[in-house]
Amino acid sequence: MLTPSILLASLLAATAPTAETPPVKSVEPVVAKEAASKTAEPASEDTPAVLKKKVVYPTTVKVQKDVAYLGETRKEKADIYSPLNHDATKLLPGIIVIHGGGFNDGDKARGRELNICENLTLQGYVCMSINYKLRRIKEQVTWPQSVYDAKAAVRYMRKEAKNFGVDPEKIGVIGSSAGCNLSMMLATTGPTDGFDVVKDEPYQDISPKVSCAIGFYGAVDLINYHDMKMFAKTREEAPELYKKGSPINYLDAKDSPMLLVHGTADVTVPLSQSESYLKVAKEKGANCTLEIIPNAPHTFDLQPKQRDLRPLVTAFFDQHLKGKTPVAEIKAPEAK
């Protein structure tokens, strides 16, 4: 299991921002900046149909595209984001970004992931947005390969830390929907849980430990959710698989600090998933906080219309990856 960190009690007080609020550099949503991009490259062959068009990457940061983090034999790649003119000898914290899509769909370069990566990179982080094994063929079993891929991403960033200018001891993760599930698996599972030592998986001699994790609107208790195609079995047929794929069952006091963000208007993954996770986390002594966003639906990035989440997310990562003291007020004003 993973090493505990300081509690977040002071991090999430619900008041308007003050002069103490951590500064967040202004950046327009990435999806609205197509005209500002100098380059546009076609999506890879594994990209879902909705992304079979040119991907417009931000020009405010440096992007290294389609890095073979799983080895040359795997089609799933990663994009590495770093600040412009970043001196690799000056190490920055790293953040793994994991897309959603129900474990069947999604891509590292969708608008949500571009938004998250650009905003966090502008705050002084090196981000690695990954593709991982998805279920694209009927009856195909893709779990636990998705978990192995997420752990391999952490190992790869740690392995290549000097090349990317990353502090190998300061790596966090953020994921949305299915990516939230994987982010929480990274925060809660360790060597005794069966995911860390796997034959033929890369970088087995390197730790997949993360220092902290953020999860947006994810299913974290699968046995109490619905049947998942990635298992190719129903909950009735294979309840143990669903339990093993649920980070709620690995919670304990040694887990990395976790922040969940969930909207009250989510009809895809109910808010009760995050509420149940928080309840068990408290019972087990895990360091977990839940931020509820009124009227927010299932899918949003760091800048939903309901509220600017950049101060919240930045403050969490700054505390656990940069050692900054959390302030009492970090919320941006909620939209009217």
Task: Specify the residue positions occupied by each region the protein language model found.
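Acidic catalytic loop of the alpha/beta-hydrolase fold
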Residues: D221-L222, A265-V269
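Catalytic nucleophile-loop/oxyanion-hole region of alpha/beta-hydrolase
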Residues: D107-I116, M128-P168, Q303-D308
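Primarily recognizes the serine-hydrolase "nucleophile elbow" in alpha/beta-hydrolase
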Residues: A152-D227, Y242
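Short substrate-entry loop that stabilizes the transition state in hydrolases
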Residues: H86-L92, I98-Q140, N181, D193-F195, ...
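Short beta-strand/loop motif that positions the catalytic acidic residue
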Residues: K254, L260-H262, D266
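N-terminal cap/lid segment of alpha/beta-hydrolase-fold proteins
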Residues: E41-K90
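C-terminal catalytic histidine-bearing segment of alpha/beta-hydrolase fold enzymes
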Residues: D79, Q140, V261, L271-K336
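Active-site nucleophile elbow and catalytic-triad environment of alpha/beta-hydrolase enzymes
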Residues: V198-P202, E236-Y250, S256
